[in-house]
């Protein structure tokens, strides 16, 4: 990078293309998700090595429950595996937060979420990895408004933000979507109003360290006016 002082404070990833990657190589969808898991862990390592304070990964949306029961069940098993691997690979390097509608998941997975957050909370000053599971931007905003009304607080931008599932996470400076699609797909609609968007054709399992580095370099060259 030309300017290390312009590292983003928060990067968001829409990890798209696992199934199409698998199909392009003649494999079932689940194979693509497993390959995507390896890329996810590698990118987490790169984020931490670069000392980017926050990164959020869109892993499973509220709409993804509509997929076939077999694929959903395979993904739930993969989530448990990923969380176990993350616990070891990121040990004492960062905090891990799971954001989304926890109530959609089985109790054993919810317990995994609670344990992982509790065990890593002390390392938030070293970085925080946010994983969006059963996440949808509209669902998040609906839940935030319900919580805000119940609290009796005055409605403001600040109070709404404080009731979001992502409360405490800075708005992403960068959103990276792999897989060629050019939309946000219900990802962080409140938080991305000033995000720099990077849409890349590479399927998520094929996304590389060099590609991420090039995006960081391009971001460093951009002048962000934020409405000014």
PLM segments and residue spans:
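Flexible, compositionally biased loop and terminal segments
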Residues: 1-228
